[in-house]
């Protein structure tokens, strides 16, 4: 009776991502797969939040890998953070062995090793710490904007307002702020030159103390890796939403194996 309930509960009419098989443990014998009864998640529900939890070695990373593989096979692009540096194995087809064969037999699943289309990214060209290179993820200061940048720099309301004035002036002059050097140069011009001070008066002044704080925080962000993160070419989110020629979703993996030394840079990226 319970098996029938499970079969009814997982009888989706819409496409679903398979995650396993149902093992019958109620008959009193050894757990055995029920023929024709697979467990899956409807693709339409996979944009919701989920938590994969478990003790060390219970398969959390492997579960995420299987989800990424299933989505890719269904033609859905995937973006994931590879904190431990072990998800790059998606690019290579797995080889069978006795342990895998035994597991397949016990769960009643069909399995064949296959590779998946994967592209590796890192933050601003930083070293992943695992000898893995990838395409740098960057953005320009202009696209990042003064509000988010103020948060990253830890500015108070007065300092944040001053930074917005700097962005406004640069925009009115048609100046693209590509990296932190550009921003520092504009702040320095507006606050430390007579010509710049005169122009700044037309939109509101910035005190020398406020400018000094902004410049110091910019220098600190540069030292923490921001110099590599801000620049061109800027990330286009559409690059993460692509499919391969065979119709499978491309898996974009952000390599973060060295995240412990990239805390400021990673928090900036999350903004």
What are these regions (language model features)?
Residues 1-55, 62-74, 78-79, 84-106, ...:
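Basic- and hydrophobic-enriched, low-structure N-terminal and domain-boundary segments
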Residues 45-47, 58, 126-127, 260:
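Residues that cap or initiate secondary-structure elements
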């Amino acid at each position: 009776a319970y098996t029938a309930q499970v079969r009814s509960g997982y009888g989706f009419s819409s496409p679903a991502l398979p995650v396993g098989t149902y093992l019958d443990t109620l008959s009193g014998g050894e757990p055995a797969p029920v023929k024709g009864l697979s467990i899956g998640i409807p693709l339409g529900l996979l944009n919701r939040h989920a938590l994969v939890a478990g003790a060390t070695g219970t398969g959390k990373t492997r579960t995420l890998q299987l989800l990424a593989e299933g989505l890719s096979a269904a033609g859905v692009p995937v973006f994931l953070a590879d904190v431990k540096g072990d998800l790059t194995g998606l690019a290579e087809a797995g080889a069978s062995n006795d342990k895998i064969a035994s597991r397949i037999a016990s769960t009643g699943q069909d399995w064949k090793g296959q590779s998946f289309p994967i592209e590796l990214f890192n933050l601003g060209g930083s070293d992943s710490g695992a000898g893995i290179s990838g395409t740098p993820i960057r953005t320009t200061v202009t696209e990042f904007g003064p509000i988010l940048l103020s948060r990253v720099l830890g500015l108070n309301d007065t300092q944040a307002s001053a930074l917005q004035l700097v962005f406004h002036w640069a925009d009115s002059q048609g100046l693209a702020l590509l990296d932190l050097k550009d921003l520092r140069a504009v702040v320095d011009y507006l606050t430390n030159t007579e010509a710049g001070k005169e122009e700044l008066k037309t939109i509101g002044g910035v005190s020398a103390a406020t400018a000094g704080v902004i410049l110091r925080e910019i220098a600190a962000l540069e030292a923490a890796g921001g110099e590599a993160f801000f620049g061109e070419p800027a990330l286009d989110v559409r690059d993460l939403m692509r499919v391969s020629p065979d119709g499978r979703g491309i898996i974009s993996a952000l390599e973060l194996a060295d995240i412990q030394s990239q805390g400021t840079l990673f928090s900036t990226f999350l903004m």
